[in-house]
Regions:
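Conserved P-loop small GTPase signature centered on TRAFAC-class small GTPases
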Residues: 1-2, 57-62, 66-160
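Switch II (G3) loop of P-loop NTPases
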Residues: 2-17
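Adenine-nucleotide cofactor-binding loop residues
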Residues: 11, 37, 102
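Structural motif corresponding to alpha-helix initiation and N-cap regions
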Residues: 13-17, 42, 79-82, 104
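Conserved Switch II/interswitch segment of TRAFAC-class P-loop GTPases
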Residues: 27-46, 68-76
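Amphipathic helical hotspot of TIR/SEFIR-family domains
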Residues: 33-61, 113
Length: 160
């Protein structure tokens, strides 16, 4: 069985949001990141989630990035509220993860969850007819990412 993986990474600037729906239509997964050191970043993440709300994306993640900087950076004046992030994740039916900008082991659970949720969406009977209409598409960049490949190996659906 071969899966086509399409991965789009879009900048969070306002001028790029007008194209967001074009990329999200037909997507199986959306991962929206925000910078925990900036409350404005969480606000932008919420705007992105609002923008894609009608795109019928079955699997969504809200990821809080740069958790390590909260303890190492001294001049953070307006960090994002974890309570607000939890509320936003619940309001938009997102799984919520905290991520560290320097440690790879914080990213692995996101890839593992994404892979397992995609596989659940497809179902365990991996036939072409089960993929039709499920919007399963992952791009080369993500498919070749070591964390994504490891999550495939770690997934309960692909164990020997």
């Amino acid at each position: 069985m071969i899966f086509r993986v399409t991965y789009w990474e879009l900048p969070g600037k306002e001028r790029h949001l007008q194209f967001l729906k074009n990329y999200c239509l037909g997507a199986a997964v959306a991962i929206v990141l925000f910078d925990t050191t900036k409350a404005s970043s969480l606000e932008k993440a919420e705007n992105i989630l609002k923008s894609i709300e009608n795109c019928d994306i079955p699997i969504k993640y809200l990821v809080c990035n740069k958790m390590d900087l909260l303890t190492t950076k001294k001049n953070i004046t307006n960090p994002a509220s974890q309570q607000d992030a939890d509320t936003i994740a619940k309001n938009y039916n997102c799984e919520y993860f905290n991520c560290n900008s320097t440690a790879i082991n914080f990213v692995n659970p996101i890839y593992t969850s994404m892979t397992e949720n995609i596989i659940k969406l497809i179902g365990t009977n991996l036939e072409l007819r089960n993929l039709i209409g499920k919007n399963i598409s992952v791009g080369k960049k993500l498919f070749n990412h070591p964390n994504f490949l490891q999550s495939l190996k770690d997934s309960q659906y692909f164990k020997d």
